[in-house]
C-alpha cells in the first residue's frame, strides 16, 4: 500500500520486482477506482530503460471498479512496461500508469483504449477522472493461482 510504504518508484521496484500475477488497485484524486492485472513477471532489470513485456496468452487486463468495466489486452506486445523509474504501467499508450511519487504530481497520464480495449468508447475523464491525475493511494497484491 503506497500510503504506508511510499509512492516512490524505488518502493514499487523493491517490493514487486521479479514477481508475477500482480493485481494493482488505484484510487485517483478524482475518486475513480481503477486497476490492472498481469500474470507476467515484473522484471525491471539493472538498466535505466523501459522494457515492454509481451503477454502472448492475452491474460492481462485493466479495469474500472467505478464503472464496473474490464478492458482486455488487444496489443500483446505492450501488456506491461517495467522501469526502475516508474510504478506499474499497463499498455504502450499508457492505458494505466503510476509514475514516481504519483501522489504529488499530475504526470500520471492515461490513454485508455490504446493497448487495452473492451470494444466500446470511453473517455479519459470517465476512466481516470481526467487525462492527467493524482494517485491518492494504490495497493499491489500478488494473486496466488
Q: What label would you give each PLM region?
A:
Residues 1-23, 27-145:
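Phosphate-recognition beta-domain surfaces
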Amino acid at each position: 500500500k503506497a500510503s504506508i510504504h511510499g509512492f516512490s518508484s524505488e518502493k514499487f521496484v523493491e517490493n514487486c520486482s521479479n514477481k508475477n500475477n500482480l493485481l494493482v488497485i488505484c484510487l485517483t484524486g478524482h475518486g475513480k477506482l481503477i486497476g490492472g492485472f498481469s500474470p507476467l513477471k515484473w522484471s525491471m532489470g539493472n538498466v535505466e530503460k523501459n522494457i515492454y513485456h509481451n503477454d502472448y496468452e492475452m491474460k492481462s487486463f485493466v479495469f474500472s471498479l467505478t464503472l464496473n468495466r474490464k478492458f482486455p489486452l488487444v496489443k500483446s506486445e505492450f501488456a506491461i512496461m517495467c522501469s526502475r523509474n516508474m510504478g506499474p504501467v499497463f499498455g504502450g499508450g499508457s492505458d494505466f500508469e503510476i509514475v514516481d511519487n504519483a501522489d504529488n504530481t499530475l504526470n500520471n497520464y492515461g490513454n485508455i483504449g490504446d493497448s487495452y480495449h473492451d470494444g466500446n468508447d470511453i473517455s479519459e475523464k470517465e476512466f481516470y477522472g481526467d487525462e492527467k491525475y493524482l494517485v491518492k493511494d494504490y495497493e499491489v497484491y500478488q494473486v496466488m493461482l
